[in-house]
C-alpha cells in the first residue's frame, strides 16, 4: 500500500508538473542484472517498495490508475474465473484463457470498475493526463512517440499530473528471459532516451519512475501431469501461473493441502482463501475470484493447467524478492536551475 501513498503524494502536490512513469517489469532485481550501477536510473534511485500483490500488471496498474487496491476493483490477476459464463477470462483481453474465444462477460472485463485518478482530477478542474501505449485510446505505437508526448505536456503545462505507462521491458523478458541481450539492450536504450527526454523539459517537473512488479526466470509444471491433483479441481487454474487460484471440489477440500504439498510444497506456499484475502490482499470482504486455496510461488516454477498454453521464459506474480521489490527513482527537473537534481 505504500506505493499508492507515494503516488497520492504526487497527485496532491502543486506548483509543478508531476510525472509517474511506470516501466512494466523493471523491478530492482532486473535493474541489477541489466543496468550499470552508475547509470541514470541508479543515480536517482532513492528507495524501494514492495509491489502490490499479486505482483502483476492487471492488479498493480489498475491500482496505480484508480488509487484502489485489487480487492476493491476486482482486477486481481491476468485471468479470473467467472461463474456467470463458467469461464476463466483474461481480464484485459476479454478472452477465454483456455479456448482463445472472446467472452460474453463484458460487464467486468475491458472496463475499469471506477474512474481513474486522472478522470477524477479532470472532473475537479485540475490538469491531469494519461500517456499510454497503442492498446489504449489515444495511445502511442512507439516508445519515442510516447516520450515525445510526455515532454510536450511537461513543456506546455506547469501544474499537471501525468501518469505514463509503457509495457517494456516486461514483454521482452517474457519472450527471451532476463539474462538475454534483447531485454538488456532494450532497457539500456530506454534509460538513455528517458534521460535525454527529461533534459528537454523546461518547466519545473518532478518524476517518479517505478514498476508494477519485478521478474524471475522460470521453469514449468503442468497439472495434466498430476492426475491426483487434476481430479480435485472444480474449475481450471486461474489468476496467475505463479499466484494460482484453486477451486476445489467439496469432497477433496480437507485432504487437498496434504496432496498439493506432497507434489509442490518445495516450490509453492499453499494458503487458504481467507488467508490470501486478509494477509496478502488486505481485503475487507471475500472476493469471488479467489478459490478455496491459492498457491504462491516461492521458487523458480510456475504452475499451469496444460503444456499447450503459452509458455513464458520469465514471469512474475510470485512472492520472491525478485518479483516484489520495485524501485523508487526520483528526478526533479527545475526551471530555475536548468539541470536535473
Predicted regions located by residue number:
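Feature captures the catalytic ectodomains and active-site-proximal regions of enzymes
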Residues: 1-341
Amino acid at each position: 500500500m505504500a506505493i499508492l501513498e507515494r503516488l497520492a503524494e504526487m497527485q496532491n502536490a502543486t506548483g509543478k508538473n508531476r510525472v509517474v512513469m511506470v516501466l512494466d517489469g523493471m523491478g530492482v532485481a532486473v535493474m541489477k542484472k541489466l543496468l550499470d550501477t552508475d547509470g541514470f536510473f541508479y543515480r536517482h534511485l532513492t528507495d524501494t517498495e514492495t509491489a502490490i500483490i499479486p505482483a502483476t500488471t492487471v492488479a498493480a496498474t489498475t491500482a496505480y490508475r484508480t488509487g484502489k487496491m485489487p480487492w476493491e476493483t476486482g482486477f486481481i490477476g491476468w485471468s479470473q474465473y467467472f461463474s456467470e459464463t463458467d469461464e476463466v477470462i483474461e481480464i484485459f483481453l476479454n478472452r477465454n484463457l483456455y479456448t482463445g474465444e472472446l467472452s460474453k462477460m463484458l460487464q467486468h472485463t475491458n472496463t475499469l470498475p471506477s474512474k481513474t485518478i486522472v478522470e477524477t482530477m479532470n472532473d475537479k478542474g485540475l490538469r491531469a493526463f494519461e500517456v499510454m501505449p497503442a492498446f489504449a485510446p489515444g495511445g502511442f505505437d512507439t516508445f519515442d512517440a510516447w516520450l515525445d508526448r510526455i515532454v510536450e505536456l511537461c513543456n506546455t503545462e506547469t501544474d499537471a499530473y501525468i501518469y505514463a505507462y509503457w509495457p517494456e521491458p516486461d514483454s521482452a523478458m517474457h519472450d527471451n528471459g532476463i539474462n538475454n541481450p534483447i531485454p538488456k539492450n532494450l532497457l539500456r536504450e530506454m534509460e538513455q532516451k528517458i534521460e535525454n527526454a527529461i533534459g528537454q523539459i523546461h518547466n519545473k517537473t518532478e518524476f517518479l519512475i517505478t514498476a508494477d512488479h519485478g521478474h524471475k526466470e522460470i521453469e514449468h509444471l503442468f497439472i495434466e501431469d498430476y492426475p491426483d491433483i487434476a481430479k480435485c479441481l472444480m474449475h481450471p487454474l486461474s489468476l496467475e501461473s505463479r499466484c494460482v487460484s484453486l477451486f476445489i471440489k467439496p469432497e477433496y477440500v480437507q485432504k487437498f493441502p496434504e496432496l498439493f504439498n506432497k507434489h509442490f510444497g518445495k516450490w509453492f506456499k499453499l494458503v487458504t482463501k481467507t488467508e490470501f484475502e486478509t494477509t496478502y490482499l488486505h481485503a475487507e470482504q471475500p472476493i469471488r475470484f479467489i478459490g478455496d486455496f491459492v498457491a504462491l510461488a516461492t521458487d523458480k516454477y510456475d504452475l499451469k493447467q496444460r503444456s499447450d498454453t503459452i509458455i513464458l521464459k520469465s514471469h512474475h506474480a510470485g512472492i520472491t524478492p525478485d518479483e516484489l521489490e520495485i524501485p523508487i527513482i526520483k528526478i526533479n527537473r527545475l526551471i530555475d536551475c536548468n539541470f536535473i537534481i
